[in-house]
Amino acid sequence: ASDGRNAVVHERAPELVVTATTTCCGYDPMTICPPCMCTHSCPPKRKPGRRND
């Protein structure tokens, strides 16, 4: 059932799916998932699950 949830996200905004297609290192940020998210080396600008563009 969780797969359907990811599928909806992909259909809504496929351009946001850059690295991970289903989960981001064990969790689903519902947005883009850069590799730095896995190593926690992302700059403290945008929070996972939110788009502050």
UniProtKB/Swiss-Prot annotation:
Q: Which residues carry this modification: Proline amide?
A: 48
Its keywords, alphabetically, are: Amidation, Disulfide bond, Gamma-carboxyglutamic acid, Glycoprotein, Hydroxylation, Ion channel impairing toxin, Neurotoxin, Secreted, Toxin
- Single GO molecular-function term? ion channel regulator activity
| Main location group | secreted
Q: What GO CC annotations are associated with the protein?
A: extracellular region
Could you tell me which Pfam families the record lists for this protein? Toxin_8
Query: Can you summarize the PTM annotation of this record?
Result: Contains 3 disulfide bonds.
**Cited InterPro entries:** Conotoxin_a-typ
Q: Which residues does the record list as 4-hydroxyproline (modified residue)?
A: 14, 29, 34-35, 43-44, 48
Q: Give the sugar-modified residues.
A: 19, 21
The residues of the propeptide are 1-12, 49-53
Q: Where in the cell is it found?
A: Secreted
Expression (tissue specificity): Expressed by the venom duct.
Which residues in this protein are found as 4-carboxyglutamate?
15
What role does it play? Probable neurotoxin with ion channel inhibitor activity.
What domain notes does the record hold? The cysteine framework is IV (CC-C-C-C-C).
Family per UniProt?
Answer: Belongs to the conotoxin A superfamily.
List the protein's name.
Answer: Conotoxin Bu27
**Which organism is this entry from?**
Conus bullatus (Bubble cone)
